[in-house]
């Protein structure tokens, strides 16, 4: 995809604060510090439009970005970070589920999993939830540059087995080397233009 224009639109916590549902949307979900913001910056060829942090739990709101005036990218809060207050953690689950449930322009979800880690219960629950609600999704394995090629293949195989799916359904990704960027755009294009 040729990126001509990208802009941050707004942050939200509830449906009344969401952007008007005028454009197709792709949402990005995953654990805290899995690299959602870095992945979005890599996809849109920007270094810092989406705020990144080495501290988990930085994204605490649903952030909407408009790409080329016709596609909305949505950065969801990360889940699973214990050092965020219990009150905030308790709000994230319902906030994300509400967005995923009511957003009629949502066309695809990109679920990010750190390639160095085994999938956790939350990832399996999300995949089951996406499937039950007939929401198309892709799984991206982030931080591939942190592993050797041999270790990447070993981990891809283990993660695919843990998720009960074929390896070719997983996209290895690195924001540092841009590995997987073109493939992810191809997959998104297929989902957005069936």
From Swiss-Prot:
Give residues annotated as binding GTP: 30-37, 57-61, 75-78, 142-145, 173-175
Keyword match Cell cycle: yes
A GO molecular function term, named singly, is: GTP binding
Q: Name one GO biological process term.
A: division septum assembly
Cofactor entry: Mg(2+)
Q: Where is the EngB-type G domain?
A: 22-194
What does the UniProt keyword field contain? Cell cycle, Cell division, GTP-binding, Magnesium, Metal-binding, Nucleotide-binding, Septation
Binding site residues for Mg(2+): 37, 59
Intrachain disulfide bonds: none
**Translocase is among the record's keywords:** no
Per the record, its GO cellular-component terms are:
cytosol
Q: Which domain of life is it from?
A: Bacteria
SUPFAM superfamilies recorded? P-loop containing nucleoside triphosphate hydrolases
> Family, per the entry?
Belongs to the TRAFAC class TrmE-Era-EngA-EngB-Septin-like GTPase superfamily. EngB GTPase family.
Q: What does this protein do?
A: Necessary for normal cell division and for the maintenance of normal septation.
Task: Read off the HAMAP family from this record.
Answer: GTPase_EngB
Protein's recorded name: Probable GTP-binding protein EngB
User: Can you name the source organism?
Assistant: Desulforapulum autotrophicum (strain ATCC 43914 / DSM 3382 / VKM B-1955 / HRM2) (Desulfobacterium autotrophicum)
């Amino acid at each position: 995809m040729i990126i001509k224009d990208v802009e941050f639109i707004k942050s939200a916590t509830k449906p009344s604060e969401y952007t008007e549902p005028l454009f197709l949307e792709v949402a990005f979900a995953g654990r805290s510090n899995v690299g959602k913001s870095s992945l979005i910056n890599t996809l849109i060829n920007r270094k810092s439009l989406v705020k990144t942090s080495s501290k988990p739990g930085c994204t605490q709101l649903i952030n909407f970005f408009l790409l080329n005036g016709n596609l909305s990218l949505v950065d969801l809060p990360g889940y699973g970070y214990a050092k965020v207050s219990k009150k905030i953690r308790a709000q994230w689950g319902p906030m994300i589920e509400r967005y995923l449930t009511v957003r009629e322009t949502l066309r695809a979800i990109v679920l990010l999993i750190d390639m160095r880690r085994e999938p956790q219960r939350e990832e399996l629950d999300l995949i089951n939830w996406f499937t039950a609600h007939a929401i198309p999704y892709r799984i991206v394995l982030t931080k591939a540059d942190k592993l050797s090629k041999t270790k990447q293949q070993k981990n891809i195989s283990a993660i695919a087995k843990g998720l009960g799916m074929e390896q070719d359904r997983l996209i290895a990704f690195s924001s540092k080397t841009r590995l997987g960027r073109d493939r992810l755009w191809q997959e998104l294009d297929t989902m957005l233009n069936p």
